[in-house]
């Protein structure tokens, strides 16, 4: 396993935390990446639909989380409006997101505002993260922070990370790791605060961290300490959330939505493309066998399914169960110079089966884009085309 930190001339974090240019500890991967990966692992485990990052800064964590398929609403809040506007475009969908839409809708919103202000648009969230945030709050804001985040917003889970001051003596000439930090807590101080807050607002909490100490200094604990708070009894009910009065104090500075299969136009584009590709693959694979059969069966329909289950040279690899399902489905056939692929055959392929629940659904979506047989039970295409002749299929 790769070492988590090295002795070298560098900074603590590679992101925000300042250390004099002397011999210092460099974490590998950098400490900020370890923190973000910790959150991503939690998201992978718990699959929250609505996630907010308070004090989102340059939106690095949001950019890491936006690829997670379970998230449908991703929100960032920060006091620095210029930074939000500058980094907002990095959260917008790229061309690849349109070519391969997500399964579920995703909306991303960046709000300018203070984390100690109440805004009802953040009610009912599954996860709220506060990564290296609380140490930037003055005493007044720190006192209000639990009332807003734990009491008012009351999400199912809250993750709070903060520097562990017991680790600081391992850095040269460090009192506070950042000039903007108002305080840095020992493990006992953080855990005392966290347990008090958890007890007051009906949460349970467990403690961990990232940034392991070097050999011989294990007693100082992690460089970054983390509290994972979970609401006792699960998430707030929709009824409880709806009882809250609307309070919109934050200013939305960036909003974007991602294409998804839940949106009719993108679902149709994906389904038509998948059907077309599968039909073309079956047609091309039939051409060599067609030449062998020519002259033997006249103009009668020819079953060209073959005796073996499909094993593509490129593309998806099927399990034995999937192969059996495909092989047992109605087989493609030819009538004259036309090639027919039954919709039931197409539905046997995993990717198409995942998109469509049944034959009727597939037919209704593709009917105005792909030619179908007279009874609508199969896709129809020309058996041979210009390109086949050019490449001598």
UniProtKB/Swiss-Prot annotation:
**Which residues of the sequence carry a binding annotation for S-adenosyl-L-methionine?**
60, 78, 114
A molecular function (GO) held by this record is:
RNA methyltransferase activity
Q: Where is the composition biased (Basic and acidic residues)?
A: 290-305
Q: Which cofactor does it need?
A: Mg(2+)
The cofactor remark states: Binds 1 Mg(2+) ion per subunit.
Q: What keywords appear on the UniProt entry?
A: Cytoplasm, Magnesium, Metal-binding, Methyltransferase, RNA-binding, RNA-mediated gene silencing, S-adenosyl-L-methionine, Transferase
Q: Name one GO cellular component term.
A: P granule
Q: Which Pfam families match?
A: Methyltransf_23
Name this polypeptide is given: Small RNA 2'-O-methyltransferase
Q: Which organism is it from?
A: Macaca fascicularis
